[in-house]
């Protein structure tokens, strides 16, 4: 007998506490596939679940890719062949996770979304997971993933500018991740900086709309936007921190920051 919606949500919370994120995904996927709009809590649980399972593998992929480059530079062909096979295994896992959540978004969540907030949230998620595919895909597959990511981010932006205030954490999180997409995937630093600066300036000009409930998340994302702008405009000398890691003097190379953009 399938678990009730209430039980699935409880089990997802339990799995989160136990750091068993694959099981958290399965429980929240069952809730998301019910055809009913998710509550804010359920939406965030779904996002956290997938972010953890994808985040661990994105970090693994970056580490393995870095090792591959070092071994290639040394001319260690036998090790490089082993590393490439291992990287391909990680990429297969990344693809499966991305395709899984993208299917849930397209088949259930986007179609059942009633509020502007939830529409922005889900279109942003769609943009994020196509972007994650574009991070490691090559040739035509990379172009396809990038095009679909751009399309989803634009759809999210169209709703966000009409239905959410500039200080709303979901609108700010969208701007943060969309700007990272322009910088990393489309190699367009000018567009990335323009988008990030516009979002930051609009939020600063509209601070009176900032609710007490979202103050912490909104100001954090505003800081991340400013951090990325500083890094991107500083002659690109200093790469930014990734979503998974803090900036560190020991970190040799990192990525522009993505924020807690999936949280309320």
From Swiss-Prot:
Q: Its domain of life?
A: Eukaryota
Q: Provide ranges: composition bias, Low complexity.
A: 236-258
One GO cellular component term, please give it: cytoplasm
Taxonomic lineage: Eukaryota, Fungi, Dikarya, Ascomycota, Saccharomycotina
What is the designated name of this protein? Answer: 14-3-3 protein homolog
InterPro entries the UniProt entry points to: 14-3-3 (IPR000308), 14-3-3_CS (IPR023409), 14-3-3_dom_sf (IPR036815), 14-3-3_domain (IPR023410)
The record's listing under SUPFAM superfamilies reads:
14-3-3 protein (SSF48445)
Q: Which family does it belong to?
A: Belongs to the 14-3-3 family.
Q: Name one GO biological process term.
A: filamentous growth of a population of unicellular organisms in response to biotic stimulus
Annotated region Disordered: the residues are 236-264
């Amino acid at each position: 007998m399938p678990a009730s919606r209430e039980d699935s949500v409880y089990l997802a919370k339990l799995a989160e506490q136990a750091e068993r994120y694959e099981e958290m995904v399965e429980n929240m996927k069952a809730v998301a596939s019910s055809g009913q709009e998710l509550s804010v809590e359920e939406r965030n649980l779904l996002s956290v679940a997938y972010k953890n399972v994808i985040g661990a593998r994105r970090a693994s992929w970056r580490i393995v890719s870095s090792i591959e480059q070092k071994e290639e530079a040394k001319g260690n062909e036998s090790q490089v062949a082993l590393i490439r096979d291992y990287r391909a295994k990680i990429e297969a896992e990344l693809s499966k996770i991305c395709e899984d959540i993208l299917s849930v978004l397209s088949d259930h969540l986007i179609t059942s979304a009633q509020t502007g907030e939830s529409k922005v949230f889900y279109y942003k998620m769609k943009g994020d997971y196509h972007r994650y595919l574009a991070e490691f895909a090559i040739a035509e597959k990379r172009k396809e993933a990038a095009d679909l990511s751009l399309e989803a981010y634009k759809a999210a932006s169209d709703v966000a500018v009409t239905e959410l205030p500039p200080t709303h954490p979901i609108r700010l999180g969208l701007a943060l991740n969309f700007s990272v997409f322009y910088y990393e995937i489309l190699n367009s630093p000018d567009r990335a900086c323009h988008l990030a600066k516009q979002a930051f300036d609009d939020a600063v000009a509209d601070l009176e709309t900032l609710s007490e409930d979202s103050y912490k998340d909104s100001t954090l994302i505003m800081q991340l936007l400013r951090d990325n702008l500083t890094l991107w405009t500083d002659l690109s000398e200093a790469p930014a921190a990734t979503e998974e890691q803090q900036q560190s003097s020991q970190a040799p190379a990192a990525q522009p920051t993505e924020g807690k953009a999936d949280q309320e």
